[in-house]
Amino acid sequence: MAVEGLKKTLVLGHRNPDTDSICSAICYAGFKHQLTGENYEPCRAGNVNPETQYVLDYFNLKAPRLVENVKTQVKDIEIRKTKGVSRGISLKNAWGLMQENNVVTLPCVTEEGLLEGVITIGDITKSYMNLYDSSIISKACTKYANILDTLEGSMVVGDSEAYFNQGKVLIAAANPDLMEFYIEPHDLVILGNRYESQLCAIEMEAGCIIVCEGAGVSLTIRKLAQERGCAVITTPYDTYTTARLINQSMPISYFMTKENIIEFSEEDYLDDIREIMASKRHRDFPVLDSDGKYIGMI
């Protein structure tokens, strides 16, 4: 009667069941399944007495499963199937997924489905408030592919799968004479189409230059950047927009909560977790299956 894998409705009689109670549960579950095609399982709320066991044996039937309580478990309520994301996706993409799916929390999972962390809309908002750490993008170990995606840019020189993991981010607003005093090795420099500024940044051993407003990059600059190991990216955005957007390229792994995550098993009873949920300020909690793998949010 019960079809494996489908959600079940349990059919029970009274406690300390007699033969009528158990036979009624078996018959009614079978009747409802035949009538609706849905999943009904006969159960019992106590031990089988000898008389009932004799009847079951006579008709070659197994005793219904014992159900010791009918408390609501996590698996009995709606679990929102918020898809897990990789730790390497950018803040921009995480924000987009939140808006698209109308959620405020995203779970970060491994390829095996294990929960690594969670990131909330509040975490993303806080990341925008860290205005004074010009090296935060390298501290976050940001992939160039994320920068390209965020800035809608093109990789002119370098490997998009490499990481920007050293140096600070700065805008080359001054002339080359002054740039020499504040550009340091491995820095990421946002600049315009001035040949002299691009040349100066590369000679000062910048790790990457971002050329704004869709400006072309000369063959000489490309060749020198290649020789010096300097990545070159072009973007259609102006320097102001580029500077505002680039922080959104950082991976969520740098900002997500990794420790002391409040998570529940699908076998947990709601009565046991209700108080825990009410005591926390956030609204979404990950749910794990019996193998410890992420299955959704409540």
Task: Identify the residue ranges that each predicted region occupies.
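Short hydrophobic alpha-helical runs that function as membrane-insertion/retention elements
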Residues: E41, P64-L66, L106-P107, V189-L191, ...
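Short, ordered loop/turn segments at secondary-structure junctions
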Residues: R15, A45-V48, E68-K71, E111, ...
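Short beta->alpha transition motifs characteristic of CBS
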Residues: L114-N130, Y237, H282, P286, ...
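Juxtadomain coupling helices with adjacent low-complexity linkers
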Residues: D123-F164, G229-C230, T234-P236
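Long, charge-dense
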Residues: S134, R222, E227-T257
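Short, small/polar residue-rich loop motifs at catalytic or cofactor-binding pockets
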Residues: N101-V103, S279-H282
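Bateman/CBS regulatory modules and CBS-like beta-alpha motifs in cytosolic regions of diverse proteins
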Residues: V67-L97, V109, Y144-V157, Y163-Y195, ...
